[in-house]
Amino acid sequence: VPKKTIIIKASDYRYPSRDELREVYKTNPDLHAFGYMSAYPMIALISMKKGIKEVHRDDHLQYWDRVLLNRNGMLSRTYYNAMVHYMRGFPDDESAFEHEHYINRIQFDQYAEIFYYHFSTVKDTLGQLLNVYYSMGFDVAKMFFKNVLAKIPDQAVSKAIMDFNVLTEITTEYRNSFTHRTPINYPDSRSTIDHTGDSLIYGSANHNFVKSSVIRDNMESTFIALAGLLDTLKMLLPQKIGGI
């Protein structure tokens, strides 16, 4: 049976409109950074109001907070774009696709995968910020989020992050699969081999995959959970640097 030919034109690609984005904005929270800033760090050092280590810490805290702000922005834009393309419509069952569904699915898949990458960078940036905030001393290149979590002295902060990790456990699995294993959004067409004693049994592919509707729901719950964590941590990690 001849396969169906789908032609996607450049004109089929449409960036989300203002009204479409506004519709997504209405139902989703904002991702906040912590607002750490010190207007005159060198003055504090020269006037001896602060020591070198404290000014150094303040500078790094501001840096990672700006990085967090930027990465929150990238994650948010990716999320909004994915949601718009999902809202434009396509069924989970590809056999039921009409022509306009293909471009919506292609665009959703693209932004969804990028979303999971940005989620990981936001989480790692938060780890870098906590490393500086609590003066843990982890080298930037050797910092792992789980190591930072283990050294957090504040139980309320630790609990907030552990609760977040539970809420986003599937998110992490999706991200790891996209990055290191098979893409979750397309059927796994690989054959299998089962070892039974001295025999090998060749098996057909299982064609398992995660439906777009399930990925969409996970993205939404992840975005809400991250916004909640950042708001909670902003209250638990008061601004401790000068010039505020």
PLM feature segments, named:
Residues 86-94:
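Acidic, Ser/Thr- and Gly/Pro-rich intrinsically disordered linkers and low-complexity segments
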Residues 108-119:
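Extended HEAT/HEAT-like alpha-solenoid repeat tracts in very large eukaryotic scaffold/adaptor proteins
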Residues 122:
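Short, positively charged
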